[in-house]
């Protein structure tokens, strides 16, 4: 899969509210806030299932009710359409899980 150009990444980010291009590497990132740890963990569980099905996995960390996510396609050396698709799926899952 080919890396997205800078203009393609910017266009994709316009359709992904809350997602930002990371300065330190070619990746996109976002933080999600939930009511509590259980909601955050439920979100991560649902994303894990979707990510496994897509064979594309996020870099993430969880502290209590916050989940920080970074997406990049390591094989391509940057952001690809796979990252954009997973970001959209994560946003939909987050909404269903009560993200604030």
Swiss-Prot record:
Family annotation (CDD domains): PCD_DCoH_subfamily_b (cd00914)
EC number: 4.2.1.96
Class of enzymatic activity (EC top level): lyase
Disulfide cross-links: none
Reactions that this protein is recorded to catalyse: (4aS,6R)-4a-hydroxy-L-erythro-5,6,7,8-tetrahydrobiopterin = (6R)-L-erythro-6,7-dihydrobiopterin + H2O
HAMAP family reported in the protein's UniProt record: Pterin_4_alpha (MF_00434)
Name this polypeptide is given: Putative pterin-4-alpha-carbinolamine dehydratase
Record organism: Rhodopseudomonas palustris (strain ATCC BAA-98 / CGA009)
């Amino acid at each position: 899969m080919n890396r997205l150009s800078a203009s393609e990444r910017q266009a994709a980010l316009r359709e992904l509210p809350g997602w930002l291009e990371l300065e330190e590497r070619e990746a996109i990132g976002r933080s999600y806030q939930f009511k509590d740890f259980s909601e955050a963990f439920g979100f991560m569980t649902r994303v894990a299932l979707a990510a496994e099905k897509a064979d594309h996995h996020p870099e993430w960390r969880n502290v209590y009710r916050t989940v920080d996510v970074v997406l990049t396609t390591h094989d391509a050396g940057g952001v690809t359409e796979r990252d954009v698709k997973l970001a959209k799926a994560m946003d939909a899952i987050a909404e269903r899980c009560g993200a604030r």
